[in-house]
Amino acid sequence: MSACQTPLIVALDFPTREAALKLADQLDPALCRVKVGKELFTSSASGIVETLCDKGFEVFLDLKFHDIPNTTAMAVKAAAEMGVWMVNVHCSGGLRMMAACREELAKRSGPQPLLIGVTVLTSMEREDLAGIGLDVDPQEQVLRLAALAEKAGMDGLVCSALEAPALKAAHPSLQLVTPGIRPAGSAQDDQRRILTPRQALDAGSDYLVIGRPISQAADPAQALAAVVAEIRG
């Protein structure tokens, strides 16, 4: 496997295996990792992860597990057995759920994926949180959940780049994975709390998830190269 030399993760947000692999075949595993989300995984099952690993990619399995502690821990174990590089769970599942996942991975003798917590989805603003009974700003809720994640022994968090400076200050050991990244001039789509790749890294993000600006580009390889050039300055 080619070791990835950048913090970039390209989201394979496609409905079919064929479409996802068509994009993957245009990308260099040395320049990016790839993310498999709910739609692609549901339509393609675990075979898509195996195929991407065989192509040399490190895979972020973005299924945001959220269930009772044992069920979630067993799902994380299954992901590890697939060979994924990163897997995530919802921090809102609570301390016991996250700790159960950490404990299950610690039993493994082989490589362990990075265990990442999802704080507040980047599409959510204060009024969205109020609608589910949380009368707080997104950043305040992120910090609450981050404290739980660190206590549970998580490796990092998914968060908006706008929350990254405060998170790095409060929890410097946590690795920050940031979606909602849009190169300069890109449309915002449905991601609200966004920054450019360079801005996100400067804010403290460790990994950057980029979707449509690369996946929907006329030349995805060229679009990826442009983002790499941007972050390398």
Curated annotation (Swiss-Prot):
Catalytic activity: orotidine 5'-phosphate + H(+) = UMP + CO2
GO cellular component, one term: cytosol
SMART domains: OMPdecase
GO MF annotation terms: orotidine-5'-phosphate decarboxylase activity
Pfam families assigned: OMPdecase
Aminoacyl-tRNA synthetase as UniProt keyword: no
Keyword terms of this UniProt record: Decarboxylase, Lyase, Pyrimidine biosynthesis
Family affiliation: Belongs to the OMP decarboxylase family. Type 1 subfamily.
This protein's name: Orotidine 5'-phosphate decarboxylase
Designated gene of the protein: pyrF
